[in-house]
C-alpha cells in the first residue's frame, strides 16, 4: 500500500484474515507444539528481539543455549560431558530439525571424506528408508549425495537390518534410522541395525556410522521407554537430531543436533567468525535468528525437569493408547500404530467400505478436526492411512469428542458411500 494505516486497523485486518486458518488445537496433522504456559509465552515475548547469533552482546542467552545443548546431549547419553561445564557437549541449537538434519548429514559426509582419503571422483551415498522426512531428500540433492532409499511393504513401514546390510558400501557416508516415523509414529529397530553394522565391520566389511533422526521421538522415548537403547549408548550412533518444537513442547521453531563427541564433528565445518568484537565459532546454516525459541525451550527444561516430561508424555501416551483401543473396536478400522511407541495413532479402513480414507478425512473436517490422510511411501503406495498426533492441548474430553465424531463420520459415509470422490494424496510432511 502507498499509505499507512492506524495500528489497530492493521491488527484487525490481519487478525480477521487469520481466523480462516481454523483452530490449531484441532489440527491433529501437525507434530508442532500449539500450547505453552502463559509464563513461557511471556518470556518468549520479552526475548523475540534478541539475535541468537550476537553471543557477545547477549551472553546470558548464549549461556542458556549452551545449557540446553548440554541437557539434550546428557539426555541422549553423549560421551565426555562434565558437570557444571555446558561447553563439554558437542552440538548446536537450530531453527528446527530440518537444519539439524542438514548439519548432521554434512558432518557424516566430511567424516567419510576423511575416512576414504582420495574422495574426488567418488559419489557418496546415504542409506535410509523411503519413509524419511523430505528434508533428507533435500540434503542429498543440495549436497550432492546419492540417496539409497530402502522400500517399505504392506504391513512393514520401517527399515530392517537386512535391508541396510544389502545397501551399504565403501561410499556410504552413513545410515539414517528414525525414532518415530512421521508416517506412523513407529520406532525403527536402531539397536538391531547397529548390531548388524557392528558385525559387518568386525568381519572386515565397511565401517558405517548411524545418525538417528529423533525429530519426533527424541523427547518422548527417554521418558516413556527409558530402558530402550537407541542413542549414544550404542557406539555406532554418532549423531542425533531432535525437534524442540515437537515433543520438546516449545513453540516453533527450535531444534538441536548433538554428536557423540567432538571427534565426530569435523573442525573444517566450524567457522570462526570475528563478529561484533568476538571470536565466535559457528556451525549453522542460518545466521541471524531470534533467541526466544531457545529461551522457551530452557523454560520447559527448568519448569518440567525429567519428572515433569515423564508425566506429560505418560498423559499423552495414555490418551493416544485410549484412542487406539477405541478405534480398534470399530469394525471399520485397522490400527497400524496404537500410540504406545510415541503418542501417534495411525489407522486405515478395514476391507472395502465403498469409500476411502480421504473421504473420512474430509468428513472429519466438517466437525472442525484436521486429520490427514495420505498414501504410504514406496513400495507401499497402495496403502492409505489416517494419522492422529496427540499433543498437549488434546485433553481426554477432546479425545472423546474426536472418537464420537469419527464414529458419526463413518456412519454418515456408510449411508452415502461416495465411492472415493477424493483423490489419493501422497504424504506431505
Could you describe each region identified by the protein language model?
Residues 86-88, 121, 337-344, 381-383:
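Short Gly/Ser/Thr- and Asp/Glu-enriched loop/turn motifs at secondary-structure junctions
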Residues 1-88, 368, 406, 429:
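N-terminal entrance/gating region of PLP-dependent enzymes' catalytic architecture
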Residues 206, 223-226, 230-343, 348-352:
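Active-site C-terminal subdomain of aminotransferase-like
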Residues 343-355, 368-403:
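Conserved PLP-binding active-site segment of the aspartate aminotransferase-like
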Residues 92-268:
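Conserved PLP-enzyme active-site core in the AAT-like
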Residues 65, 69-72, 100-109, 136, ...:
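Buried hydrophobic packing segments
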Residues 60, 93-100, 128, 132, ...:
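Secondary-structure capping and boundary motifs in well-ordered enzyme cores
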Residues 200, 380-429:
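PLP-dependent enzyme catalytic core of the Aspartate aminotransferase-like
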Amino acid at each position: 500500500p502507498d499509505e499507512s494505516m492506524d495500528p489497530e486497523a492493521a491488527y484487525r485486518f490481519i487478525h480477521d484474515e487469520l481466523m480462516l486458518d481454523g483452530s490449531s488445537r484441532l489440527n491433529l496433522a501437525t507434530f508442532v507444539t500449539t500450547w505453552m504456559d502463559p509464563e513461557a509465552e511471556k518470556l518468549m515475548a520479552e526475548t523475540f528481539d534478541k539475535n541468537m547469533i550476537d553471543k557477545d552482546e547477549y551472553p546470558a542467552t548464549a549461556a542458556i543455549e549452551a545449557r540446553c545443548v548440554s541437557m539434550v546431549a546428557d539426555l541422549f547419553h553423549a560421551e565426555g560431558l562434565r558437570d557444571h561445564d555446558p561447553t563439554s557437549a558437542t552440538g548446536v541449537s537450530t531453527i528446527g530439525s530440518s537444519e539439524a538434519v542438514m548439519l548432521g548429514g554434512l558432518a557424516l559426509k566430511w567424516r567419510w571424506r576423511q575416512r576414504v582419503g582420495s574422495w574426488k571422483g567418488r559419489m557418496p551415498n546415504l542409506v535410509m528408508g523411503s519413509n524419511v522426512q523430505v528434508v533428507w531428500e533435500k540434503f542429498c540433492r543440495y549436497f550432492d549425495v546419492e540417496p539409497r532409499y530402502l522400500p517399505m511393504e504392506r504391513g512393514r513401514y520401517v527399515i530392517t537390518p537386512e535391508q541396510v546390510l544389502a545397501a551399504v558400501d565403501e561410499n556410504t557416508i552413513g545410515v539414517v534410522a528414525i525414532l518415530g516415523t512421521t508416517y506412523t509414529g513407529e520406532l525403527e529397530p536402531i539397536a538391531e541395525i547397529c548390531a548388524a553394522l557392528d558385525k559387518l565391520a568386525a568381519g572386515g566389511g565397511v565401517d558405517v556410522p548411524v545418525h538417528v533422526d529423533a525429530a519426533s521421538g527424541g523427547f518422548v522415548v527417554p521418558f516413556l521407554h527409558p530402558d530402550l537403547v537407541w542413542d549414544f549408548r550404542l557406539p555406532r550412533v554418532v549423531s542425533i537430531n531432535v525437534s524442540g518444537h515437537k515433543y520438546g513442547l516449545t513453540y516453533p521453531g527450535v531444534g538441536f543436533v548433538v554428536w557423540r563427541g567432538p571427534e565426530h564433528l569435523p573442525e573444517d565445518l566450524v567457522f570462526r567468525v570475528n563478529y561484533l568484537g568476538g571470536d565466535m565459532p559457528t556451525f549453522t546454516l542460518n545466521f541471524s535468528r531470534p533467541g526466544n525459541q531457545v529461551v522457551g525451550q530452557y523454560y520447559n527444561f527448568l519448569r518440567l525437569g525429567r519428572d515433569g516430561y515423564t508425566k506429560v508424555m505418560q498423559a499423552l501416551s495414555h490418551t493416544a493408547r485410549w484412542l487406539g483401543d477405541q478405534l480398534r473396536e470399530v469394525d471399520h478400522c485397522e490400527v497400524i500404530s496404537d500410540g504406545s511407541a510415541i503418542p501417534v495413532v495411525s489407522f486405515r479402513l478395514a476391507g472395502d467400505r465403498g469409500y476411502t480414507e480421504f473421504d473420512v478425512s474430509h468428513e472429519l473436517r466438517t466437525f472442525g478436526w484436521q486429520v490427514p490422510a495420505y498414501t504410504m511411501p514406496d513400495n507401499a503406495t497402495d496403502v492409505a492411512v489416517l494419522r492422529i498426533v496427540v499433543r498437549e492441548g488434546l485433553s481426554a474430553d477432546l479425545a472423546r469428542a474426536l472418537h464420537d465424531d469419527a464414529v458419526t463420520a463413518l456412519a454418515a459415509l456408510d449411508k452415502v458411500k461416495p465411492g472415493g470422490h477424493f483423490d489419493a494424496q501422497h504424504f506431505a510432511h
